[in-house]
Amino acid sequence: MLTLKIFVYTCVIFFSSLFIFGFLSNDPSRNPNRKDLE
């Protein structure tokens, strides 16, 4: 049961960080050099 809980928390943190880093890297205000988003 403890192993399952640790596995679930790891997946949640992994996908959350993946979403956050992907959102930050795709944010035009943080990366003004990328003009292909417009």
Swiss-Prot record:
InterPro entries xref list: PSII_PsbI, PSII_PsbI_sf
UniProt GO cellular component terms: chloroplast thylakoid membrane; photosystem II reaction center
Keywords: Chloroplast, Membrane, Photosynthesis, Photosystem II, Plastid, Reaction center, Thylakoid, Transmembrane, Transmembrane helix
UniProt key word Transmembrane: yes
Predominant localisation class: plastid
Presence of keyword Aminoacyl-tRNA synthetase: no
Pfam families according to UniProt: PsbI
Subcellular location: Plastid, Chloroplast thylakoid membrane
GO biological process: photosynthesis
Domain of life: Eukaryota
Family statement: Belongs to the PsbI family.
NCBIfam families assigned: PRK02655.1
Subunit structure: PSII is composed of 1 copy each of membrane proteins PsbA, PsbB, PsbC, PsbD, PsbE, PsbF, PsbH, PsbI, PsbJ, PsbK, PsbL, PsbM, PsbT, PsbX, PsbY, PsbZ, Psb30/Ycf12, at least 3 peripheral proteins of the oxygen-evolving complex and a large number of cofactors. It forms dimeric complexes.
General function of this protein: One of the components of the core complex of photosystem II (PSII), required for its stability and/or assembly. PSII is a light-driven water:plastoquinone oxidoreductase that uses light energy to abstract electrons from H(2)O, generating O(2) and a proton gradient subsequently used for ATP formation. It consists of a core antenna complex that captures photons, and an electron transfer chain that converts photonic excitation into a charge separation.
PANTHER family, per the entry: PHOTOSYSTEM II REACTION CENTER PROTEIN I
Name of the protein in its database record: Photosystem II reaction center protein I
Organism: Cyanidioschyzon merolae (strain NIES-3377 / 10D) (Unicellular red alga)
Native organism taxonomy: Eukaryota, Rhodophyta, Bangiophyceae, Cyanidiales, Cyanidiaceae
Encoding gene per record: psbI
